[in-house]
Amino acid sequence: MSTKYKTTLAVLAGVALGAVAMQGLHAQAKPKAYTVSELETLDAAANAAFVPVIQAAQKAAGGRPLRTGGGKIVAMEGAAPKRVAITEWDSLEQAQAFYKSKAWNDLTPQREKAVKTIRRYVVEAVN
């Protein structure tokens, strides 16, 4: 085999491998998602017991609790909610699956004693 032929084959192989690698990287690049729960505490003691339980359930499902209600909420436009909980997920589908899961449904009695949900939604982080 001539050197020119070997070089051409090597370049073509490199291009093919690079294309396959880029395809794989592109397929994995799903945007993260965030659930935002606007809440009102109904019972402080029940809420204190509920927070670690819900965080453990979210973590078991792949979620990462970012904010669980403490700290200031400053209204920029409109009224600020009394309490906000934010959880990061690897994808919109992962967040939706958790909120349709048995683990979430099993927490309903405890959750309903602790907090009143004003609004809950999922935001997909797309650049």
What are these regions (language model features)?
Residues 96-99, 109-115:
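Short, exposed beta-strand-loop hairpins at the edges of beta-sheets
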Residues 112-127:
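C-terminal end-helix/capping segment
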Residues 13-100, 123-127:
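Short S/T/G/P-rich N-terminal loop/turn motif that feeds into the first structured element of a domain
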Residues 66, 107-108:
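Short, hydrophobic secondary-structure boundary micro-motifs
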Residues 1-12:
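Bacterial N-terminal signal peptides that target proteins for export
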